[in-house]
Amino acid sequence: MSANNGVTGKLSSRVMNMKFMKFGKTDDEESSNSNTPSNINSDVEPIEQKGKLFGLDDSAWDLNSYKDDLKKISGKEKKKVKRVVYKKRPNLIISNVGYSELRKPEGVISGRKTFGDNSDDSGSRKRKFDEGEQNEDEKRDAKDKEFTGSQDDGEDEYDLDKLFKDSIKKKKTNHNGKNKNRNSKK
């Protein structure tokens, strides 16, 4: 390819901006070469006066000059902020993190509380009440066994299982008999 041919294809916006900046610089050089009276004096004038007359030219993309301008304007150099890096703590592993474990009321006495009573007395009362309930439950279980007779749990399960299987067999025989009747009617 020859150098005279233009660039074909799409150019990115950065490349296009660089091209325009290049053309802007060449235009400035050509205008400074002309012999107009304002341009003759412009070589002598400092940059600050140009900035006052024409405003700052933002087309120049020079970050260092921008920082220098900021230093001149503010009169102070900006301090660099030191970043403090904190070391991350190791993760704590907790074994019981379930909802019921987290919501467990610790030190809370469930039930009614009368004002003016000591908490120690109410705790001992509660323990006595719980023990009384357990004794009553044991007594009920003993009475139930006496009433029903001394059957073991294994025998009860065997009887229930046998009844269940018999009921399933009856349902199957009834269902098959109905299907035979329907087929014969058709």
UniProtKB/Swiss-Prot annotation:
GO cellular component: cytosol; nucleus
Pfam annotation, one family: MPP6
Biased composition (Low complexity): 32-42
Range of residues in the leader sequence: none
UniProt keyword list: Acetylation, Nucleus, Phosphoprotein, RNA-binding, rRNA processing
Highest taxon in the source lineage: Eukaryota
Disruption phenotype: Lethal in combination with the absence of either RRP6 or its cofactor RRP47. Weak but detectable stabilization of unspliced pre-mRNAs, and stronger stabilization is detected for mRNAs with defects in 3' cleavage and polyadenylation.
Residues annotated with Phosphoserine modification: S42, S150
UniProt entry tagged with the keyword Signal: no
Compartments (UniProt record): Nucleus
Region (Disordered): 22-47, 95-186
Main location as per UniProt: nucleus
Modified residues (N-acetylserine): S2
Biased composition (Basic and acidic residues): 122-147
Biological process, per Gene Ontology: exonucleolytic trimming to generate mature 3'-end of 5.8S rRNA from tricistronic rRNA transcript (SSU-rRNA, 5.8S rRNA, LSU-rRNA); nuclear mRNA surveillance of mRNA 3'-end processing; nuclear mRNA surveillance of spliceosomal pre-mRNA splicing; nuclear polyadenylation-dependent CUT catabolic process; nuclear polyadenylation-dependent rRNA catabolic process
GO molecular function annotation: poly(U) RNA binding; protein-containing complex binding
Key word Mitochondrion present: no
Annotated Basic residues bias: 168-186
Misc remark: Present with 1350 molecules/cell in log phase SD medium.
Quaternary assembly: Associates with the RNA exosome complex.
Family of this protein: Belongs to the MPP6 family.
Protein task: RNA-binding protein that associates with the RNA exosome complex. Involved in surveillance of pre-rRNAs and pre-mRNAs, and the degradation of cryptic non-coding RNAs (ncRNA) derived from intergenic regions and the ribosomal DNA spacer heterochromatin.
Protein name in UniProt: M-phase phosphoprotein 6 homolog
Species per Swiss-Prot/TrEMBL record: Saccharomyces cerevisiae (strain ATCC 204508 / S288c)
Gene expressing this chain: MPP6
